[in-house]
Amino acid sequence: MKNNYTSLKSPLDEEDELKTDHEIDLEKGPLPEYDSEEEGALPPYSDHALVNNPLNTHRENHSYGTTDNSSPLLIILLISFTSIILFNAPAFCYLKYKDAFFKNYGAAEWTLFGFWCLVCTLALIFLTYFYETWSKACGKGIKHFLKNWRNMIFAFCKSSLFCLVLLKAENKLSSHLGDQRWGWKCSASAFTFMAVSSILIFIAETVEPGSCSTDLVKRTLAFYGYEIRQHVNEDATILLREMNPESEA
């Protein structure tokens, strides 16, 4: 029985297929030799091989360029400890200048020193634990602070004037007390208050000019003006009642 099968492909299609079989993919390179006798062996470019091994391609694409953005614990501790040292530096310098650093300390002074060490330790733990939060907040605050750098001159003058007034009052109070021990305590307290307050005034006046001087005076005048008006109204009401006692009846 003869096979009457006839191919529907034209001779031109058969030539194109032969050319395609011998063409080389420029991206993949020449096909390696394929041994069909090995069990489970598949051509490296087959669809089944690509489907079964997608992880290798993903690893090759993402094996480079991956970095860890988290800060090491040692660097975080160093930054937090440095910030605490900078905060305590003015007090240390003042005590060293007065030659009162660890001299003539009694029970009260050592208790205060131990409490201050405890506060610094807790602050170090807090700054280390919330490092990401306060570092981002400080970064945003510094950027906003530097945008208003033109106000720094007037802010510095106002904070300097505040320091001069406070120092004058501290000298008067220390000389009035007379006792060296109480005078030293008054000086240390006044210096600490002056340092913290002057820094806060400088920052506030730089960010919003007049917030600590003009606005404060306006609010004080408005408050006292309101109190005066209330007092005048009460006096006028009492005077009218005394002049017209019949109206009350």
Swiss-Prot record:
Task: Give the way it sits in the membrane.
Answer: Multi-pass membrane protein
Q: Tell me the leader sequence span.
A: none
Which superkingdom is the protein from? Eukaryota
| Pfam families membership | WTF (PF03303)
> Where, by residue number, does the polypeptide cross the bilayer?
73-93, 110-130, 151-170, 187-207
Predominant location of this chain? membrane
The alphabetical list of record keywords is: Membrane, Transmembrane, Transmembrane helix, Vacuole
Per UniProt, subunit arrangement is: Homomer. Interacts with other proteins that exhibit high sequence similarity.
Protein name according to UniProt: Meiotic drive suppressor wtf25
- Origin organism is Schizosaccharomyces pombe (strain 972 / ATCC 24843) (Fission yeast)
